[in-house]
Curated annotation (Swiss-Prot):
NCBIfam families: 16S rRNA (cytosine(1402)-N(4))-methyltransferase RsmH. Disulfide bonds: none annotated. InterPro entries: RsmH, SAM-dep_MeTrfase_MraW_recog, SAM-dependent_MTases_sf. Its main location: cytoplasm. Pfam families: Methyltransf_5 (PF01795). One of its GO terms (cellular component) is cytoplasm. It comes from the Bacteria. Signal peptide: none annotated. It catalyses: cytidine(1402) in 16S rRNA + S-adenosyl-L-methionine = N(4)-methylcytidine(1402) in 16S rRNA + S-adenosyl-L-homocysteine + H(+). It is an enzyme of class 2 (transferase). GO terms for molecular function: rRNA (cytosine-N4-)-methyltransferase activity. This is Ribosomal RNA small subunit methyltransferase H.
Amino acid sequence: MTETFQHISVLLNESIDGLAIKPDGIYIDGTFGRGGHSRTILSKLGENGRLYSIDRDPQAIAEAAKIDDPRFTIIHGPFSGMAKYAEEYGLVGKVDGVLLDLGVSSPQLDDAERGFSFMKDGPLDMRMDPTSGIPVSQWLMEADLDDITWVIREFGEDKHARRIAKAIVAYREDEENEPMVRTGQLAKLISDAAPKSFKEKKHPATRAFQAFRIYINSELEEIDTALKGAASILAPEGRLSVISFHSLEDRMVKRFIRKESKGPEVPHGIPMTEEQIRALGSANMKPIGKANKPTKQEIDMNPRSRSSVLRIAEKL
């Protein structure tokens, strides 16, 4: 029996409004997920509008296959390939809006078999696309102490990174222990390794699980490439709407928009003519409004939306 997992799209209306959808426009949803944003975009498009959605999760692709609409195309792959896909479909410079809903979807978190959650025991996997790459369990068996520490500290911002890494290495080096292949095993190990003074409201494994997921899926590299790709394929006045779910993601998006909205930096003291400065280029995008956060009502309905932030930019 197949269990059905519900996904509630976060900041749905705000992110779609941010795209300023034109009925005959061309749009890309870089993260189809379970289709909440894509279906809403389609509902606002006219007969000549087009939507291209991307996802690397086979379950998302299966969900997208249920949409029987000639205006809709689903692409199986990472959103970092957006510029390549746009080139293949002849969309470069013609896209009126790109939506990116970063992070893990609720169905991925709630499905124990995907291995994302420390709340439900399942295979220690965490891959967005289970058909490629290696699971977290294999990486933890092979990585050295310094690498594990770095990943937890860099991507989980966990001050107990070294302590957790030592516990993982000690566990795997004890021949009497069973191989660590379950999320429950890792969650318990991290909880046991946490200092008795641990007072955070979050589960002790929260940050480490986030770190391993980000690392195994190269999430930050994917985001960086996707943001650059989106900027390169948008038409003038095309919109970029990005929802992030933790500080690492939001900082990347904020810095990207800030960088794209500035003109070229000319080192102080270097003599240049106006013509030479113009030749360096100008600002590529402009931010639209301030960062959006979910309302109390949305948070009450969907607690997972609490940390989400929406940023919108427009191509110049």
